[in-house]
Curated annotation (Swiss-Prot):
One GO BP: translation
Stated name of the protein: Large ribosomal subunit protein bL33c
Molecular function terms, GO-annotated: structural constituent of ribosome
Sequence similarity: Belongs to the bacterial ribosomal protein bL33 family.
Gene: rpl33
Length: 66
């Protein structure tokens, strides 16, 4: 039985490479992914390596605030 409904939350992951390139206007946008995380198992910010279509390579995507 679940102890609470707010254990799993929806988070947005944003590419860290696109954020740095937007100053130089090299990329056309910012890549974002939507996923879930368990707040009890991972209380810190989530960072995953995902494919960025703007950079055209695998980059680190970090959790952002809503």
């Amino acid at each position: 039985m679940a102890k609470g409904k707010d254990i799993r939350i929806i988070v947005i992951l944003e590419c860290t490479g696109c954020d740095q390139k937007s100053v130089n206007k090299e990329s056309s946008g910012i890549s974002r992914y939507i996923t879930q995380k368990n707040r009890h198992n991972t209380p810190s910010r989530l960072e995953l390596i995902k494919f960025c279509p703007c950079c055209r390579k695998h980059m680190i995507h970090a959790e952002i605030k809503k």
